[in-house]
UniProtKB/Swiss-Prot annotation:
InterPro entries: GPCR_Rhodpsn (IPR000276), GPCR_Rhodpsn_7TM (IPR017452), PAF_rcpt (IPR002282). Residues 39-54, 114-133, 206-208 are cytoplasmic. Belongs to the G-protein coupled receptor 1 family. Residues 1-16, 75-91, 156-184 are extracellular. Glycans are attached at N169. Pfam families: 7tm_1. This is Platelet-activating factor receptor.
Length: 208
């Protein structure tokens, strides 16, 4: 078999695999995250939320933002990689994926640091106004990441390619990238910096 034939098989295989995997993730994710939000809403009045609970609720909300886009991707791959929805939904799906990824990383980082503070400085942590700090830090995280993700709304997210399985053309979503774009370079630098910053925080808190 020729090399290009192998890549074609791999490409076709994802149209079967991804809808199945995404469907499982969607069902389990909605149930699990919905249950977490229900528990917090029922058992903990909002005024009694401490810092760690605030971070956990925000982490759950970030996951839910990603989950609501999965039906779009399921339909996309079921249609052989053809985006049948309006273009702005492709931009929105990419934006929410970015937000989920980096909000999750950020909130896992601050949760780790919160536990580090609780273990190393229990008295000072207990006396601090952690609820106010948790709300403020959560707002900073959301504003920073949503601001960076807003770039996805101005991207040319879709492109038209010939349909390899038949006649006509199909529309791809985020499957082509412009080269030499300064904004793309900036966003990639932000991604790498953010990841390693949080990674170092988590590593430090677990090793010290």
């Amino acid at each position: 078999m020729e090399p290009h034939d192998s890549s074609h098989v791999d490409s076709e295989f994802r149209y079967t695999l991804f809808p199945i995997v995404y469907s499982i993730i969607f069902v389990l994710g909605v149930i699990a995250n919905g249950y977490v939000l229900w528990v917090f809403a029922r058992l903990y009045p909002s005024k009694k939320f401490n810092e760690i609970k605030i971070f956990m609720v925000n982490l759950t909300m970030a996951d839910m933002l990603f989950l609501i886009t999965l039906p779009l991707w399921i339909v996309y791959y079921q249609n052989g990689g053809n985006w049948i929805f309006p273009k702005f939904l492709c931009n929105l799906a990419g934006c929410l994926f970015f937000i989920n990824t980096y909000c999750s990383v950020a909130f896992l980082g601050v949760i780790t640091y919160n536990r580090f503070q609780a273990v190393t400085r229990p008295i000072k942590t207990a006396q601090a106004n952690t609820r106010k700090r948790g709300i403020s830090l959560s707002l900073v995280i959301w504003v920073a990441i949503v601001g960076a993700a807003s770039y996805f709304f101005i991207l040319d997210s879709t492109n038209t390619v010939p349909n390899s399985a038949g006649s006509g053309n199909i529309t791809r979503c985020f499957e082509h990238y412009e080269k030499g774009s300064v904004p793309v370079l900036i966003i990639h630098i932000f991604i790498v910096f953010s990841f390693f910053l949080v990674f170092l925080i988590i590593l430090f808190c677990n090793l010290v």
